[in-house]
């Protein structure tokens, strides 16, 4: 996963992230501002799932995206 691609396009990508993880608020996403560790932590907090499962889910999500 090339997270730099996500960080560099955060304003466009955060809508897709919110579609996948709807419990994340706009304020959460603004605070995360593309930081992978913060995103993982916030998903763990909102969904109550383990970090390794969050990373797997993020990898799966990333691989399903169409990157231009």
Regions found by a protein language model. Name each.
Residues 1-68:
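Intrinsically disordered, low-complexity, hydrophilic segments
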């Amino acid at each position: 996963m090339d997270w730099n691609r996500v960080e560099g396009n955060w304003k466009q990508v955060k809508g897709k992230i919110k579609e996948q993880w709807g419990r994340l608020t706009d304020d959460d996403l603004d605070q995360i501002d593309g930081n992978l560790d913060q995103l993982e932590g916030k998903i763990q907090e909102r969904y109550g799932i383990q970090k390794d499962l969050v990373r797997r889910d993020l990898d799966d999500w990333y691989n399903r995206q169409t990157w231009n």
